[in-house]
Amino acid sequence: TVTISGGTITEASGGYMAAGIGSGYQGLGTVTIEGDAVIKNAQGGEAGAGIGSGTYGDSNILIRGNAVIENAESSANGAGIGSGQGDLYLDGDGMVIDPTVGNVTIEGNAKIENAKSGYGGSGIGGGAIGIGNVIIRGNAQIGNATGGEEGAGIGGGALGTRDVTIE
């Protein structure tokens, strides 16, 4: 579990399959960014989220208060903000889908600018083969959420499903 309640973090980078801020490979937990926290340039490694989970990791992300996030990015298959990449493989009986699971809630006066992913991931939501929900409410502001090829700006990544609610 990671909680950031204030201050400024710049240049947080995850290695291969890890998030820039959050969990590593197969990590579980919650990432909360709140208060007057400012995050600039959170970069996930390939298949990891910029902010959220690494590959095969499940996490919930809560961004609230007056938090500001600028430039959260996954190089490929993870979300800019959300889950990393899940798995798809052959078993003796057929295809097995093992998704990452994560929910993203953005609320209060939180502001996000430039959340993006490379191939397969979403800007905000799921990585490739990821499931969960995105909830945006209150006075939250989002500018420039960009998914990679086969990924949504806000929603699911490739082969993933997401419910998006704006309240």
Regions found by a protein language model. Give the residues of each.
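Beta-rich catalytic cores
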Residues: 17, 47, 77, 120, ...
